């Protein structure tokens, strides 16, 4: 049975926007949205992938996400949704990420980029000398896990058989999707940023796989470009993961990163402001130049989040001094 196309008034696609909260709807609705996004960009028809096959793949992928606070299935849904909206909203991106294989790689790598995430970072895996760290030689440990999990799952569903081996479609898919997922390793962020800044001056230096990787990385760094209530929800979740990791490290006698300790409101706001100033703003400003103006609204929201944290710190400082919150001042919604 064929999925309903966007132009045929798909109910699932009507729900999709940047500030869509997957926690507010049923798991079935989230799955329907994912299937509709894959269908809407034309990859299922072009690659002759039956709806029941992609449905089975999505459910299999979903089963490999654990109930950790942040790196769960709803996180990757949010990343996938943002990648989809960037693709659908930018004529430039549509022209560059134009083939069915490239578009399929964009959406599938977004969906799979945190598969089997344990709820801690690479630093923990390396410090604890985990089996994963040994397997992947301390290099992009979790990203290699996510990537491997994706390909094992896709091969289990014989997805490679739907791609033309004579045209190298499966090989191209593997190249693009692998590049995208490995590029979500934050240790690669500074290198990626320099490449994006260089590409702003000369976009012709980029391959399709670079564009896909940058879009996925952008979406992965997108929480603070959402409405304030959603941004705070994701903030709570990432700091809960930090607390959980710090507790595990303390139990194992491992060194704990300072940003994972004593996470009171002031510390959290300062960490978030620093993350915006030194990571998010430079990246989003560069991407907004690479994809001219198509990310402007998200960039405005990011700057508003920065202003909101300034207000949060101001309110907390007045409370500390015994002056109360004062009036109706507070962060913008």
Predicted features along the sequence, with ranges:
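Internal amphipathic alpha-helical repeat/solenoid segments
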Residues: 42-68, 88
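Hydrophobic transmembrane helical bundles of multi-pass organellar membrane proteins
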Residues: 58-61, 76, 279
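Generic alpha-helical segment signature
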Residues: 27, 50-54, 76, 143
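Divalent metal-dependent phosphate-bond-processing catalytic cores, especially two-metal-ion Mg2+/Mn2+ enzymes
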Residues: 1-43, 70-71, 86-100, 108-333
């Amino acid at each position: 049975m064929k999925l309903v196309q966007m132009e045929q008034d798909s109910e699932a696609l009507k729900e999709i926007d940047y500030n869509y909260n997957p926690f507010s709807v049923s798991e079935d609705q989230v799955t329907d949205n994912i299937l509709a996004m894959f269908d809407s960009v034309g990859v299922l028809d072009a690659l002759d992938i039956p709806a029941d096959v992609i449905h089975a793949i999505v459910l299999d992928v979903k089963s490999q996400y654990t109930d950790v606070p942040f790196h769960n299935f709803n996180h990757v849904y949010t990343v996938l949704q943002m990648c989809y909206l960037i693709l659908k909203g930018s004529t430039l991106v549509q022209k560059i990420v134009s083939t069915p294989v490239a578009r399929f790689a964009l959406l599938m790598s977004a969906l799979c980029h945190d598969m089997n995430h344990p709820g801690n970072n690479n630093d923990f895996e390396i410090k604890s000398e985990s089996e994963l760290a040994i397997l992947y030689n301390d290099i992009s440990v979790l990203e290699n896990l996510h990537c491997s999990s994706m390909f094992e799952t896709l091969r289990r569903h014989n997805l490679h058989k739907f791609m033309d081996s004579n045209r190298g479609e499966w090989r191209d898919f593997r190249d693009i999707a692998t590049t995208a997922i490995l590029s979500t390793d934050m240790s690669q962020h500074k290198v990626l940023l320099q490449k994006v800044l260089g590409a702003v001056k000369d976009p012709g230096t980029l391959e399709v796989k670079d564009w896909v990787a940058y879009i996925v990385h952008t979406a992965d760094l997108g929480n603070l470009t959402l409405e304030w209530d959603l941004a705070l929800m994701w903030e709570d979740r990432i700091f809960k993961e930090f607390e959980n990791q710090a507790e595990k490290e303390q139990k194992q006698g491992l060194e704990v990163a300072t940003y994972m300790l004593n996470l009171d409101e002031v510390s959290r706001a300062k960490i978030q402001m620093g993350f915006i100033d030194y990571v998010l703003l430079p990246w989003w400003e560069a991407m907004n130049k690479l994809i001219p103006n198509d990310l402007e609204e998200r960039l405005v929201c990011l700057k508003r989040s920065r202003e909101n944290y300034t207000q949060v710190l101001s309110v907390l400082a007045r409370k500390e001094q015994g002056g109360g919150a004062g009036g109706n001042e507070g962060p913008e919604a």
